[in-house]
């Protein structure tokens, strides 16, 4: 199952019907009553109770993405792919929906792959970060284990040494290791890298820095 950056909802359908479409496809033998009860569970889970009959045009970007997440998790997938799901959402809403994503993952324990250009988002949400070389022939350069304990508080992470170490490591990769050319092995990080990383606002989005890598 995939959650896209551009929401990809059926514009003529309500919130409830967009989610129900996925549930019925996943469970064609279910009675309508069971389907509706299951759909309502996921509507409530993403905080859209009361908005069930609204169509996508009447929703904010954050609400639309909540519908997309609810639709994806309602199929109870073993593997879920998130393609920059928070890229079009403002920073405050992004944090709220990220927390909802973690809660849904905690309940389902599905395997989730998320594509992101935000270094902090990757560290806060994931158990492992896959660092890729630059395109057009991008390859896996390194797997970074994120062993920060859960649940993770953004406020607490700001002063967490392991969080700062991970953030610095990934940023240095973007500077030193991501630009391996075609036919070259990923260079990785120089052990004697001397550049320092500005950590004044460790939770700031880093989309520009990552997308240039």
For each of these PLM feature ranges, what is it?
Residues 16-24, 36:
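Short helical segment in ABC ATPase nucleotide-binding domains corresponding to the A-loop/adjacent helical element
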Residues 1-7, 111-113:
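ABC nucleotide-binding domain signature
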Residues 27, 32-51, 103:
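Conserved ABC ATPase "signature" region
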Residues 55-59, 63:
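Conserved ABC ATPase signature
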Residues 69:
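Hydrophobic anchor residue at the start of the ABC signature
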Residues 74-78:
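A short, proline-enriched helix->beta-strand linker immediately N-terminal to the Walker B motif
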Residues 80-83:
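Catalytic Walker B motif of ABC-type/P-loop ATPase nucleotide-binding domains
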């Amino acid at each position: 199952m995939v959650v896209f950056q551009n929401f990809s909802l059926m514009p003529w359908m309500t919130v409830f019907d967009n989610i129900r479409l996925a549930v019925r496809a996943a469970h064609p033998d279910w009675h309508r009553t069971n389907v509706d009860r299951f759909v309502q569970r996921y509507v409530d889970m993403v905080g859209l109770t009361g908005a069930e009959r609204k169509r996508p045009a009447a929703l904010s970007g954050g609400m639309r993405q909540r519908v997309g997440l609810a639709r994806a998790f309602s199929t109870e997938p073993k593997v879920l792919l998130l393609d920059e799901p928070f890229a079009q959402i403002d920073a405050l809403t992004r944090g709220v929906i990220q927390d909802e994503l973690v809660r849904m993952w905690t309940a389902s324990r599905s395997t989730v792959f998320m594509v992101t250009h935000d270094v902090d988002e990757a560290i806060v949400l994931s158990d492992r970060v896959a660092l890729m070389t630059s395109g057009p022939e991008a390859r896996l350069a390194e797997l970074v284990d994120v062993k920060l304990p859960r649940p993770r508080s953004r406020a607490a992470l700001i002063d967490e040494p392991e969080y700062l170490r991970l953030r610095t490591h990934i940023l240095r990769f973007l500077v030193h290791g991501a630009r391996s050319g075609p036919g070259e092995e990923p260079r990785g990080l120089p052990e004697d890298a001397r550049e320092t990383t500005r950590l004044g606002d460790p939770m700031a989005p880093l989309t520009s820095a990552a997308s240039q890598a």
